[in-house]
Swiss-Prot record:
It holds the Pfam family Aminotran_4. Gene3D superfamilies: 3.30.470.10, D-amino Acid Aminotransferase, subunit A, domain 2. It comes from Haemophilus influenzae (strain ATCC 51907 / DSM 11121 / KW20 / Rd). One of its GO terms (molecular function) is catalytic activity. It comes from the Bacteria. This is Uncharacterized protein HI_1169.
Amino acid sequence: MYPLFETLCIENGKIQNINLHQVRYERSLREYYGKSAVKIFNLFSLIQLPTPLQNQLIRCRIDYNAETTQIQYFEYQRKIYRTFQPVICDDIEYSLKYSDRSLINTLFAQRGACDEIMIIKNGKVTDCSIGNLIFRQGKKWYTPDTPLLLGTQREKLLQEGKIQERTIFQEDIVNFDEIKIINAMNGL
């Protein structure tokens, strides 16, 4: 069984944000397994993209446990998400990228006619089912300071100064001009 996973973007044969994924992978292993011995792999060395996929947009999924990994490659088409259904869940915990997404899937099923959900925890906006959220107000982009998962794309955009953290309550959502999903496959 693989309790954790990473999703990486490979665009035209180049792995995106590999260093941030490596850091999160190692941190997640240590947090999940505590003081138990773990085998840490170099993710870059593990990825062997098949030649027919070299010039495509690829979603690479690495499932892992304390001793081994399993890698899968999928062609990917970016989507535009226009509508978000707020769903309240005060007891959700997703600080690690868990393979068991049953609670997230249950919440996603509540989206109704919307494209995606917006998870509200203790009155604050957190994430959606597949990534972090960013909110545009005028020319500035903000991301909730209460994410469920510290995403690698979110971290990259924060480091670059392209987005800023702030508390976003559910009632604040109407004050923004645009909402976007960011994750390994979708940047700003």
